[in-house]
Amino acid sequence: MDYRQLHRWDLPPEEAIKVQNELRKKIKLTPYEGEPEYVAGVDLSFPGKEEGLAVIVVLEYPSFKILEVVSERGEITFPYIPGLLAFREGPLFLKAWEKLRTKPDVVVFDGQGLAHPRKLGIASHMGLFIEIPTIGVAKSRLYGTFKMPEDKRCSWSYLYDGEEIIGCVIRTKEGSAPIFVSPGHLMDIESSKRLIKAFTLPGRRIPEPTRLAHIYTQRLKKGLF
């Protein structure tokens, strides 16, 4: 798959923040109408201190049948700095993206979207590069305040930055911690909430696209795939 190269990656942190502040102005939070046919999940892990592994899994929806899996392993040069995850993981994701043959309708990232100090988590940032609707799904809160949803499957609450709604917190599995969902690009809050609920099977905490992508990253790290 093609993508737009919007900036250099070899930037110091202070310049990376300036890039984020400029790119955030280009984000479009628009409703996603209808149902997707193909959904991708993205997961990244770090087998070594300076080595990263990116996996993209494309699924048929609503069967969640796996259609394609691509990966890219390579050197990580950007330091770990909260809020600048895209500069650490983005280059590897894009190299994996280039290998992809099946164009997804929606891409789900293991990370943040709008729920970010500068409103540009990895789902938003990469969404601008690939120009496909994206959603960020995180296992923990990076930014914002919320009221804990009740311990009932599919209960939820909004995530706020002051009075602005920046995402939602969804209890996908009773007895488990909620997940943090926010739109990336070409997606809005209500659509991202609706889709992630639909992508999460009963008894699962994590939606199928990123859950399956994570399984493949673990297999690849162990040399099993």
From Swiss-Prot:
Site, Interaction with target DNA: residue positions: 80
Pfam families tied to this protein: Endonuclease_5 (PF04493)
One GO cellular component, as annotated: cytoplasm
A molecular-function term among this protein's GO annotations: magnesium ion binding
Assigned protein family: Belongs to the endonuclease V family.
Designated name of the protein: Endonuclease V
Organism: Thermotoga petrophila (strain ATCC BAA-488 / DSM 13995 / JCM 10881 / RKU-1)
Catalytic activity: Endonucleolytic cleavage at apurinic or apyrimidinic sites to products with a 5'-phosphate
